[in-house]
Design a protein with these regions (language model features):
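Ferredoxin-type iron-sulfur electron-transfer modules and their immediate structural context
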Residues: 1-138, 257, 262-278, 369-373, ...
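Residue-level detector of alpha-helix initiation sites
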Residues: 79, 145-147, 312-314, 444
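A short, basic/flexible loop-to-alpha-helix module at the beginning of a structural domain
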Residues: 120-139, 249, 288-303
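Feature captures the FAD/FMN-dependent oxidoreductase FAD-binding
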Residues: 133, 138-140, 190-274, 366-377, ...
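Phosphate-coordination loops involved in phosphoryl transfer and adenosine-cofactor binding
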Residues: 135-138, 206, 302-306, 361, ...
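N-terminal Rossmann-like FAD-binding beta1-loop-alpha1 element of flavoenzymes
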Residues: 138-163, 315-323
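Rossmann-like dinucleotide-binding cores of NAD(P)H-dependent redox enzymes
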Residues: 164, 168-205, 319-366, 472-488
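FAD-site-proximal beta/loop scaffold in flavoenzymes
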Residues: 278-303, 393-447
Length: 498
């Protein structure tokens, strides 16, 4: 798109619009809030957290001024605790289960307290956990999102030589590229990646697992110089300094490593299968969000009127960010009713406060070249039984209708079993139908929260260690997710299960 279809706002205003919606606590605020906690025995909040963080434990350490100890409790159960402090749906997890919510209708602000402690740790040079004594075993991890980072962190603590293969220029997966910037700045995800790298985990970015290959040493050498130069300047490697994408074959991956963990997430955005889907001005929501994450505001494509298709949390991220970039009108179109939307209620309320319009029970049937000054027109049909046809004039259409499962990758390349919904089949230890291959995250659960993926990465690390060493180890919060929790996650991941 040209500059005419980019944000009309000045950079200062955009920066204000994208400031974190939940501000950091001051030390005084954190102290007061921490002292409200009842420090429950067998705390409901701890059970409600998929990674089972010892919530009363870390809050009590905040109250006593031991922030390093508090952060250690958090990262012991969840290696991406700073990310989850920002993006977790705490209203339906830990804070939703808080006893104070029942008593006073005001739960302890667990998410903000967790952020307070983890931000302290990320801003402090003191390492929380160190790499374990080398045990001579090697593990390859495909994907550097929440599940991959979590698994790598625990394996490093156990002394494994861990290499993460990531196809994007930067590590962090969805946390780095797919979270709304006003919820979580990209810098937070990259800081957690850096902490895990300091534990000896190697990150081979711009590296895709495919059919041809080069050795790990050759692959690592191709990015080593750029990373070394960046390290000297104490900065994140700019995208333009990272070499072009290289391909590593899955067969060689299996030869190089004693175990492989697949944490590749989901694939491309689902196709709508309607006329006009490939017109200029039609874009995938994840592409739109990824562009915003660069914070190069004036290069982000934007229409004056934006139509977003879908009603999941990704759709909410798209509509709110389009509005905050300066779109004059943003409309969210969904084929079902508001109560059927998979987005959380508080996410919908945020979009409403931002001035987003909603059209419920309307299915897109085509995208047309626009008339009367509009670049496009979204043609819809009512799904309320009336079959009424209408058009939404717009300059941009954003598709947020879920992502495809990577069936070909798992069936043809990895050769592991998948279920009828395209999810990798795993046991309680995250082991697949191939005993050497483990899997976790969205590719195994169909699409849930970052915190769910972090827990699966933890369970996989335990499973890999037991499989390779015969030793049973349990990290903090190793309980498997409850049936109720899994069902809730499945509902809110429904946009990816279409």
């Amino acid at each position: 798109m040209t500059d005419a279809f980019c944000s009309p706002l000045d950079v200062r205003q955009i920066e204000e619009n994208f400031a974190e919606i939940n501000p950091a606590m001051t030390s005084a605020e954190a102290g007061v809030e921490a002292n409200r906690c009842l420090y429950c025995y067998d705390a409901p909040c701890m059970h409600a957290c998929p990674t089972h963080i010892d919530v009363p434990g870390f809050i009590k350490k905040i109250a006593s001024g031991n922030l390093h100890g508090s952060a250690r409790v958090i990262f012991d159960a969840n290696p991406i605790g700073a990310t989850c402090a920002r993006v977790c749906p705490v209203e339906v997890l830990c804070e939703g289960a808080c006893v104070e919510k029942t008593l006073l209708q005001k739960p302890i602000e667990i998410g903000r307290l967790q952020r307070y402690a983890t931000d302290y740790a990320l801003g402090n040079e003191k390492q929380i956990f160190e790499k374990g004594e080398p045990n001579g075993k090697s593990v390859g991890i495909v994907g550097s999102g929440p599940a991959g980072l979590s698994c790598a962190s625990y394996l490093a603590r156990l002394g494994y030589d861990v290499t993460i293969y990531e196809k994007k220029p930067l590590a962090g997966g969805l946390d780095t590229y797919g979270m709304a910037e006003y919820k979580m700045p990209q810098s937070v995800s990259l800081a957690e990646v850096e902490r895990i790298a300091q534990m000896g985990v190697k990150f081979l970015t711009n590296t895709q697992v495919g059919k041809i290959s080069e050795s790990p040493a050759e692959a690592e050498a191709s990015v080593a110089e750029a990373i070394a130069n960046a390290d000297r300047d104490d900065r994140v490697v700019p995208v333009e300094e990272i070499p072009a994408v290289q391909i590593v074959s899955f067969d060689d991956l299996m030869k190089w490593h004693d175990a492989v963990f697949l944490a590749v997430g989901l694939g491309r955005t689902n196709r709508l299968g309607i006329p006009g889907e490939d017109l200029e001005g039609v874009i995938d929501a994840l592409q739109f969000i990824e562009k915003i994450k660069t914070r190069e505001w004036k290069t982000v494509p934007l229409g004056k009127t934006v139509a977003v298709l879908g009603a999941g949390n990704t759709a909410i991220d798209a509509v709110t960010q389009a509005k905050r970039l300066g779109a004059e009108r943003v409309v969210m179109v969904y084929r079902r009713t508001e109560k059927d939307a998979s987005a959380y209620d508080y996410e919908l309320e945020l979009a409403k406060k931002d001035g987003v319009e909603f059209i419920w029970q309307a299915a897109p049937i085509g995208i047309l070249e626009g008339e009367n000054g509009s670049r496009l027109a979204l043609r819809c049909e009512r799904t309320d039984g009336s079959l009424q046809l209408f058009e939404v004039p717009c300059d941009m259409v954003i598709k947020a209708v879920g992502q495809q499962k990577m069936r070909a990758f798992f069936e043809r390349l990895a050769g592991v079993e998948i279920d009828e919904r395209g999810r990798v089949v795993v046991n309680a230890s995250m082991q697949t139908s191939n005993p050497k291959i483990f899997s976790g995250g969205d590719c195994a659960n169909g699409g849930a929260e970052a915190v769910d993926a972090a827990q699966m990465g933890k369970l996989a690390a335990q499973g890999i260690h037991e499989n390779l060493s015969g030793e049973r180890v349990r990290f903090a919060g190793s309980e498997a997710p409850s049936i109720e929790r899994s069902e809730r996650a499945a509902h809110h991941g429904a946009e990816n299960n279409a």
